């Protein structure tokens, strides 16, 4: 599992990016957030996640808010 910080997240569109120190930003889709109900992330929020290879490159999976 990696840890990072939410760089930005557009709740209307349902996606954003997670910043990982010393690495490229990682795409995150709302469906990857482990949370019941409304799935969203806040800018600057700390998260833990796995990186998987998606159709358009690396993306976050199993995202957990810290």
Curated annotation (Swiss-Prot):
One of its GO terms (cellular component) is cytoplasm. CDD domains: CSP_CDS. Residues 1-66 form the CSD domain. It is found in: Cytoplasm. GO terms for molecular function: nucleic acid binding. InterPro entries: Cold_shock_CspA, Cold_shock_domain, CSD, CSD_CS, CSP_DNA-bd, NA-bd_OB-fold. Keywords: Cytoplasm. It comes from the Bacteria. PANTHER family: COLD SHOCK DOMAIN CONTAINING PROTEINS (PTHR11544). Involved in cold stress response. This is Cold shock protein CspA. It comes from Staphylococcus haemolyticus (strain JCSC1435).
């Amino acid at each position: 599992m990696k840890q990072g910080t939410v760089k930005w997240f557009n709740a209307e569109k349902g996606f954003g990016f997670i910043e990982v120190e010393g690495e490229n930003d990682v795409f995150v889709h709302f469906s990857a957030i482990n949370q019941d109900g409304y799935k969203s992330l806040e800018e600057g929020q700390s998260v833990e996640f796995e990186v998987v290879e998606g159709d358009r490159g690396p993306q976050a999976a199993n995202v957990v808010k810290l």
